[in-house]
Amino acid sequence: MSEDRQGRSTDTGKILYCSFCGKSQHEVRKLIAGPSVFICDECVELCNDIIREELEEKAQSARSSLPKPREILEVLDQYVIGQNRAKRTLAVAVYNHYKRIESRQKNDEVELAKSNILLVGPTGSGKTLLAETLARLLNVPFTMADATTLTEAGYVGEDVENIIQKLLQKCDYDVEKAQQGIVYIDEIDKISRKSENPSITRDVSGEGVQQALLKLIEGTVASVPPQGGRKHPQQEFLQVDTKNILFICGGAFAGLDKVIQARSTDVGSIGFGAKVKSAERKQEVGKVLAEVEPEDLIKFGLIPEFVGRLPVVATLEELDEPALIKILTEPKNAITKQFKKLFEMENVELEFRPDALSAIARKALKRKTGARGLRTIVESVLLDTMYDLPSQENVSKVVVDESVIEHKSEPYLIYQTPAAPEQKAAGAE
């Protein structure tokens, strides 16, 4: 006797039965054949239900251990220096977001609205790091997207649904996991519309992208090609519901402070009785940004519907010299700690003098790169030393001071010899 893959007997008169429930081939729709066993479609469905219930139980147990806002803030403090107001805002918003997901599963009568987040702050102030740290803490899939590469569907560039595809890739195409992930969209200020007045021409990388992002951010079912394939009509798509995905949008919004100041200044105050803006107020960009209102974002170039989808706004302050010095030394993964670890692997101690840290911070401020530029400065100063060090012997310590940062001298190498330690500058004869 022989059977095909659906369990149909090729010999007449022979009835086949499911090896699990015992039902015959006439009582079920499908009977799938394995090596000497059969399973019916009903048993397959039952197995799927059992697996699905176990996955839901795991997800619920993971959510029951959701850290409280105070605990989220404590973790953020370990990695991000300063920006206390922004960190508190994020901690509360993220906690409420995942509580909202829990509420939806309980089918409560009151439906909680989704609260996506907008981060406003200068380059290098910690926007991306905050989003990354949150995702790592909550153990959820996380992906980043650059708004400047996005275009409307049908135009050259990335489709907005590619963002969801990247999120799926981060969790090995597990749709359930992806539907509770975090998406960070950077440079969101770069897709502001080119003028306040509606244009008769298409703005495919500005207002057009904002329109395309609206439904995705609010909550829709996105069709994503499996395993990163290209879309074509005959293809089956993965359906990803974005209503529980937390979207965090970030941007520098250069010039937004001027928009806020223009609003807060009395328009009618002209002539001798006019209020004069002080130079001090002009310099306090961080404090000005903290007063941002939805109307300011609309004036800047975001469409009203898009601003409405980002109800939580957190502003970050520009980092000053003391804050940059703390960033160099205090976080768990501080830059100086990372380089010290690299030198430890060569059995060499690395020391940064206090004046060196100040010089690094001043240089980063001068370049207007914020915390992002700190690593570049340290890397350039230690490059030659890291190149030569593995080939040198008896080096016990490397010292970096202000003169090294200013490129007036090389890092100081301290040699350990059996007789006595000898100190000299690298490259000295």
From Swiss-Prot:
ClpX-type ZB domain: residues covered: 6-59
GO CC annotation: HslUV protease complex
Name of protein: ATP-dependent Clp protease ATP-binding subunit ClpX
Species lineage: Bacteria, Pseudomonadati, Pseudomonadota, Gammaproteobacteria, Lysobacterales
Gene3D superfamilies in the cross-refs: 1.10.8.60, ClpX chaperone, C4-type zinc finger domain (6.20.220.10), P-loop containing nucleotide triphosphate hydrolases (3.40.50.300)
Organism: Stenotrophomonas maltophilia (strain R551-3)
A GO biological process held by the record: cell division
Keywords recorded for this protein, A-Z: ATP-binding, Chaperone, Metal-binding, Nucleotide-binding, Zinc
Keyword Chaperone: yes
Pfam families: AAA_2, ClpB_D2-small, zf-C4_ClpX
SMART domains referenced in this protein's UniProt entry, alphabetically: AAA, ClpB_D2-small, zf-C4_ClpX
SUBUNIT field: Component of the ClpX-ClpP complex. Forms a hexameric ring that, in the presence of ATP, binds to fourteen ClpP subunits assembled into a disk-like structure with a central cavity, resembling the structure of eukaryotic proteasomes.
Record gene name: clpX
PROSITE patterns on file: CLPX_ZB
GO molecular function per UniProt: ATP binding; ATP hydrolysis activity; ATP-dependent protein folding chaperone; protein dimerization activity; unfolded protein binding; zinc ion binding
Entry-linked NCBIfam families: clpX (TIGR00382), PRK05342.1 (NF003745)
Family per similarity comment: Belongs to the ClpX chaperone family.
HAMAP family referenced in this protein's UniProt entry, alphabetically: ClpX
Function: ATP-dependent specificity component of the Clp protease. It directs the protease to specific substrates. Can perform chaperone functions in the absence of ClpP.
Positions annotated to bind Zn(2+): C18, C21, C40, C43
Cited InterPro entries: AAA+_ATPase, ATP-dep_Clp_protease_ClpX, ATPase_AAA_core, Clp_ATPase_C, Clp_protease_ATP-bd_su_ClpX, ClpX_bact, P-loop_NTPase, Znf_CppX_C4
Keyword Zinc: yes
Binding, ATP: P122, T123, G124, S125, G126, K127, T128, L129
